[in-house]
Regions:
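Short glycine/serine-rich donor-binding loops of glycosyltransferases
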Residues: 58-62, 79
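Conserved catalytic-core segment of nucleotide-activated headgroup transferases in glycan assembly
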Residues: 1-22
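Acidic donor-binding loop of glycosyltransferase active sites
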Residues: 44-56, 69
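Nucleotide-activated donor-binding/catalytic signature segment of Leloir-type glycosyltransferases, i.e.
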Residues: 18-37
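Short alpha-helical donor nucleotide-sugar binding micro-motif in glycosyltransferases
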Residues: 41-46, 145
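A charged, aromatic-enriched C-terminal amphipathic alpha-helix characteristic of glycosyltransferases
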Residues: 103, 119-160
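Conserved acidic donor-binding segment of nucleotide-sugar-dependent glycosyltransferases
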Residues: 84-105, 113-120
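Short hydrophobic beta-strand element within catalytic cores of glycosyltransferases
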Residues: 70-73, 80-83
Length: 160
């Protein structure tokens, strides 16, 4: 974001924060710990949520979509279960973000530059992003677990 000269807000704290603050330009703002409500407020106002990590299932990108923000993320790990990339190959899918292929600053730069140059944020409708995020709600999770348990129980009972 130093090269992009676009505003970036980093929320949270960690061992690298001071180092990052020291090498960041004035377009980058750091917020330590803020309330969940404030996080939602920031997400609802941003052009995109950038997520460069790898997790089995990252909840933060889903929370960003719930707030109406598209996701720009590294295309590995659990993010592939939640983000459908905006491109020509998947016109049938709900598009809710962009994926970069390599976990490098250059790939992030290129993807965000494309997002900005083509004004891609205009292609994402906050209400569609929110609706898609509901696939990952607690209620849906409980229903799927309940269904799986009942199915296993029925299978077990048939063997007895």
């Amino acid at each position: 974001f130093n090269k992009l000269n676009l505003p970036l807000i980093i929320i949270g704290d960690g061992p690298e924060r001071l180092k990052l603050e020291n090498i960041s330009n004035s377009n980058i703002k750091f917020l330590k710990r803020i309330s969940d409500r404030k996080v939602e407020e920031y997400m609802s106002r941003c052009k995109a949520f950038v997520y460069a990590g790898i997790e089995d299932f990252g909840i933060a990108p889903v929370e960003a979509m719930a707030s109406g923000a598209p996701v720009i993320a590294y295309g590995k790990g659990g993010i592939l279960d939640t983000v459908n990339c905006l491109n020509e190959q998947n016109n049938e899918k709900v598009k809710n973000g962009l994926l970069f292929k390599k976990q490098t600053s250059q790939d992030i730069f290129d993807t965000i530059s494309w997002f900005e140059d083509k004004k891609l944020w205009k292609k994402f409708k906050p209400e569609n992003l929110h609706e898609y995020s509901l696939k990952f709600s607690i209620e849906k999770f409980i229903n799927k677990i309940d269904f799986s348990i009942n199915k296993a129980w029925d299978k077990f009972n048939k063997k007895i």
